[in-house]
Structure formats: C-alpha cells, structure tokens
Amino acid sequence: MANLEVQEKDGEIYCPLKGKWLIAKPEEKVRQKFIATLVNEYGYTLDQMAQELELTGSKRGKGHAFADIVIWKSKADKDAMKDAFIIIETKAENVKLHVEDYYQGSNYAKFSGAEFFVSSNEIFHCSSWFYT
C-alpha cells in the first residue's frame, strides 16, 4: 500500500475518511496526521476506520457524543457494526490535555465497547486498555 500523505492547500486539508476537503483547523490537522500515522506506521486501513462517528449509548444528556477517530479490528467488523476496537480523541497541538479530556474520551470508548482509548494533541499521547 502506498503511503498516505496529509494534503493541505488553500486553507483546507483533505480528509480521506470522509472523501472531502475540510477547513484546516488546528485540531483537524492533528486528526489527519494521526490518521496518516495509523495507516503508514501501524498498518491500519482506511476502510476499517471512521471519523467523527456519533456514538450510541452515550450518557451526555441531550447532546451528541462524537468520536474523532474510530478503528475496528477489520473492515468486516466495521461493516457488521460490531464494537469498535480503538477510539481516538484529538486536540489541537496547542491545547494541553487535561484529565477531563481524558475521562471524556475514555467514557466514549467505554460507551462504544472499545478495548482501547487514545487521546492526543500530537505532542502528548495518553492511552488505556479496557478489559472486558
């Protein structure tokens, strides 16, 4: 598989998981770089991932919970709508990760049945395994 490169032009960044160009906000840049790392360094495929996926089972009241990046063990698991394997929450590079951010993301992971959670601002990464 060819390397996935982050593409930016005219204030936009290409989102391969959505198949479209988005405004290149700082958090979006971190998100797209993380997706490229997942593909290029860890061997995940785009067809086993989703971006900004609404989570069911969230206890956020009337609001909606969206996971920045979701990874399933395989495309077949994603297509069968099985529990996610990994939930990733990203923040802009200049945003310090706080314990509240970590708990928010880990709750998203638990709600979705994921086994693993990662929070990243590109500089610092936190992660947890959830044993079921």
Model regions: which residues?
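A short, conserved, highly charged catalytic patch centered on acidic carboxylates
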Residues: M1-F116, I123-T132
